[in-house]
Amino acid sequence: MKHLAIFGSTGSVGQQALAIIRSLPHLFNVVALASYGNKRDLFFEQIREFSPSIVSVYDEQLYFEIRKEFPKVQAFLCEEGLLAAATANEIDTIVAASSGIVALPAIIAAMRSGKTLALANKEVLVSAGELINGLAQQYQTKILPIDSEHNALYQCLEGRDTSEVRKLFLTASGGPLLYKSKEELTRVTIQDVLKHPIWNMGAKITVDSSTLVNKGLEIIEAYWLFGLEHAEIDAVIHPQSLIHGMVEFEDGTVLSVMNPPSMLFPIQHVLTTPKRCPAPHKGMDFSIKQILEFFPIDEERFPSIALARQVLQDKGSSGPFFNAANEILVQRFLKKEIAWCDILDKLTRLMKNHRVSSCTSLDDVFSVDKEARALAQEI
């Protein structure tokens, strides 16, 4: 039985992780739940159903309500609860499904405590990949990627020598604006951007999908996860989102992972590995016609890919700067302060003007993050 802490339990990935746990109750014990939003009713339902001994929230009113409603549960406010879960002896696996880098100190504490890290948070590796990789080697941390693309690559590479790999391919749906002309892109609305043709995701990641910044972040994440050179990591448009990642080996053979576009598949793989367990969700249906298309990304139209490659060349502070600046620009777009086209234009200018510095500690990461947010708010 695995003993789990779920960071971000009321978010999309957190809820789906609990759905998998619900379907395989004999395999899991939920020891800790952490929520970053104010979804009171949902979080209370989760506490009642899974009976965690540790809970953590970021809303002070909700914290006091939990203490009153669940007096036997250890309730914590803000980072204190994440750190309590990260260092609890009875927990062996942390499911990091929160967004941003708020959980970074707890993730590092978990690594130092010998926990397995089930990682659904790409910002952690984008912002602190060098730091995380160093700790993973030092403490022999097992990092299991939940992102569908990286999970697919992980499955293809499992037990194989990366020296035999020619190239990794992440697939991209192309997002909601894939077939719009350059002229049409100047007039897109928030409603246009949030209508993703395949995935049902939060607003921020859906905007990132439309600019392909999400794919840029994933290229950076793949670099830190798999230890290949950035020239050996690529992305291709695959509108059907049935193939999630491909590995081309030196002999020209390509291995891939195929499943319907649902996070339930990579989440279940990570939670149950090394076993393959019966799934409550449906797999591929080959009784109907399936079409698979692949074509290259227009990097002139989507400079986010080139920006990600520049981050990997520069390293240091460029990762946390890129991540934080983009996050603020997306927020400004969603508030109707800037146009969609401004996101990549302003991000390109910010990255061009950024002076790369060393970034080897938590303080460094948070300092660069703060600087990038301020500059992205002003530009």
From Swiss-Prot:
Tagged with keyword Glycosyltransferase: no
The encoding gene: dxr
Binding site for 1-deoxy-D-xylulose 5-phosphate: K122, S148, E149, S173, H196, S209, N214, K215, E218
Known function: Catalyzes the NADPH-dependent rearrangement and reduction of 1-deoxy-D-xylulose-5-phosphate (DXP) to 2-C-methyl-D-erythritol 4-phosphate (MEP).
Enzyme Commission designation: 1.1.1.267
Keywords for this protein: Isoprene biosynthesis, Manganese, Metal-binding, NADP, Oxidoreductase
Residue numbers binding NADPH: T10, G11, S12, V13, N121, E123, G202
Binding-site list for Mn(2+): D147, E149, E218
Cofactor: Mg(2+); Mn(2+)
Protein name per Swiss-Prot or TrEMBL: 1-deoxy-D-xylulose 5-phosphate reductoisomerase
InterPro entries from the UniProt entry: DXP_reductoisomerase (IPR003821), DXP_reductoisomerase_C (IPR013644), DXP_reductoisomerase_N (IPR013512), DXPR_C (IPR026877), DXPR_C_sf (IPR036169), NAD(P)-bd_dom_sf (IPR036291)
Catalytic activity: 2-C-methyl-D-erythritol 4-phosphate + NADP(+) = 1-deoxy-D-xylulose 5-phosphate + NADPH + H(+)
Recorded metabolic or biological pathway in which this protein acts: Isoprenoid biosynthesis; isopentenyl diphosphate biosynthesis via DXP pathway; isopentenyl diphosphate from 1-deoxy-D-xylulose 5-phosphate: step 1/6
Provenance organism: Chlamydia abortus (strain DSM 27085 / S26/3) (Chlamydophila abortus)
HAMAP family xref list: DXP_reductoisom
Single biological process term from Gene Ontology: isopentenyl diphosphate biosynthetic process, methylerythritol 4-phosphate pathway involved in terpenoid biosynthetic process
Lineage start: Bacteria, Pseudomonadati, Chlamydiota, Chlamydiia, Chlamydiales
An annotated Gene Ontology molecular function: manganese ion binding
Family: Belongs to the DXR family.
